[in-house]
């Protein structure tokens, strides 16, 4: 399938790389995306809409960035993602970019959970969570070294 993107131009994407979000992300109608990982943008990857060339979200793989971060899914979320007890998931965090790396944050309240076997994803809204919506990505605020990450998918 050929898709037009405003950032990367015309791309040829295999049909099996299309991710479906049965429940669109809050505020967006698009439900079909693909994961792009241009090496020059590492550690970031892009969740690119296949239907809207201008809609893409910058993300990082949570387990590479914050290994202790965990998301508990409800039985309804398991069902919506077509998961069972043997299924693997990949949890992505949406990134808010900034000119100064110290100001780059990730949204821990709204992770995107992907079932890579079925290519189904869902943004999980962790209401009342102890997690912030703007957590420093590189831990500079806590004096940690810069974290090197990569997107899996």
Swiss-Prot record:
Gene3D superfamilies xref list: BH3618-like (2.30.290.10)
Highest taxon, organism lineage: Bacteria
SUPFAM superfamilies (UniProt xref): BH3618-like
Gene Ontology biological-process entries: bacterial-type flagellum assembly; regulation of translation
Compartments where found: Cytoplasm
Keyword Chaperone in record: yes
Chief place of localization: cytoplasm
Pfam families with a match to the protein in the record: FliW (PF02623)
First and last residue of the signal peptide: none
Keywords in alphabetical order: Bacterial flagellum biogenesis, Chaperone, Cytoplasm, Translation regulation
A GO CC term attached to the entry: cytoplasm
Job description of the protein: Acts as an anti-CsrA protein, binds CsrA and prevents it from repressing translation of its target genes, one of which is flagellin. Binds to flagellin and participates in the assembly of the flagellum.
Family statement drawn from the similarity comment of this UniProt entry: Belongs to the FliW family.
Record note on quaternary structure: Interacts with translational regulator CsrA and flagellin(s).
Name of the molecule in the record: Flagellar assembly factor FliW
Species assigned in the record: Geobacter metallireducens (strain ATCC 53774 / DSM 7210 / GS-15)
Gene expressing this chain: fliW
């Amino acid at each position: 399938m050929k898709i037009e993107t405003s950032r990367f131009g015309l791309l040829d994407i295999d049909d099996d790389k299309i991710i479906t979000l049965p429940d669109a992300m809050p505020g967006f109608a698009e439900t079909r995306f693909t994961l792009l990982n241009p090496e020059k943008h590492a550690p970031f990857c892009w969740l690119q809409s296949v239907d809207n060339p201008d809609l893409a979200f910058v993300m990082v793989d949570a387990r590479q960035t914050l290994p202790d971060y965990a998301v508990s899914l409800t039985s309804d979320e398991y069902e919506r993602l077509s998961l069972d007890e043997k299924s693997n998931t990949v949890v992505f965090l949406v990134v808010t970019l900034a000119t100064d790396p110290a100001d780059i944050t990730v949204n821990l309240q709204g992770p995107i959970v992907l079932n890579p076997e079925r290519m189904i994803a869902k943004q999980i809204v962790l209401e009342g969570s102890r997690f912030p919506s703007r957590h420093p990505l590189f831990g500079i605020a806590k004096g940690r070294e810069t974290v090197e990450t990569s997107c899996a998918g």
